[in-house]
């Protein structure tokens, strides 16, 4: 979601993005904005994304270029707000843009992205209907984003320390882990955790005082705040915490790529869900290449290798899920029965909500620091 995206992102995310720098950049070239597009060929395909988040995998860019003749050029952002600003200030520059679903409708309303002709997407019918047909991506009978990957913001634990897999969010408040809990410093995410732990809807908690009190109860538990996947991995490797909030795709990479003793949990109370989509920028100068690129990105061919090689969020393409190895994280954990029903997909926040959540979290942090 990095909406809180693995994204966050999210690799946020919703951590994603919460997002990685694992991809080779030898083929996918970065440039720094409108000024550096001067002199580029008409066939150049301009992609705006988090750095290291799938679309700039060197092998994939090379394969796509060989097949289509479309040269892929990347530009990057470090936050959703920066992404929106780049689209606003550089009209007619970009072709494909990665947008967390929370921001898709806003981008469409502002005229920053255009409808996608889904008849040109060969993988359309294989996309998970719950994500593909979401009102976050579709409005007025038109599709403004193609669901690409999804993930969960929940928690992961150190399997060297905790021998029995926890099934409740209350493990974060368990006195046996006092001084051994890691927590991401993000107001929206913090309020969402507090809401879920108090039995409320994280998108619209009715009793923010209950959320505040639950978060204040973290005081004896906290070891440290964290902000990036790399930081999380270093803390875990340094044995700084037993359990910590985390992103699903990042947990898979921590275990697979860095061989850390990590297991991800989606508790019985539920967890934060997010998904990212690929959109066609308004006035895209190379729309034909853009649609081919989006179709390739959502294909099983791309996704299975991406996930197998470095680890990725879960695919929105059900056919891709079926082609993953039997022991793959995104089949064993993310594909377990009833998973979607246990997720609270984050909805777009109003400015008033964001302000309230930020003020609440800043107050809580002040108290926690005393």
Please describe what each predicted stretch is.
Residues 54-55, 77, 98-237:
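Extracytoplasmic ligand-binding site segments that recognize negatively charged/polar headgroups
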Residues 209-218, 258-282, 328:
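Periplasmic-binding protein-like
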Residues 42-107:
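Early extracytoplasmic/lumenal segment of secretory-pathway proteins
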Residues 234, 337-370:
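Conserved C-terminal helix/tail region of periplasmic/extracytoplasmic solute-binding proteins
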Residues 154-161, 195-199, 274-287, 305:
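A bilobed periplasmic-binding-protein/Venus flytrap-type ligand-binding module shared by bacterial periplasmic
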Residues 1-15, 22-31, 38:
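N-terminal secretory signal peptides
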Residues 103-108, 237, 243-261:
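A ligand-binding cleft/hinge motif common to bilobed small-molecule-binding domains
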Residues 281-342:
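Mature extracytoplasmic/periplasmic domains
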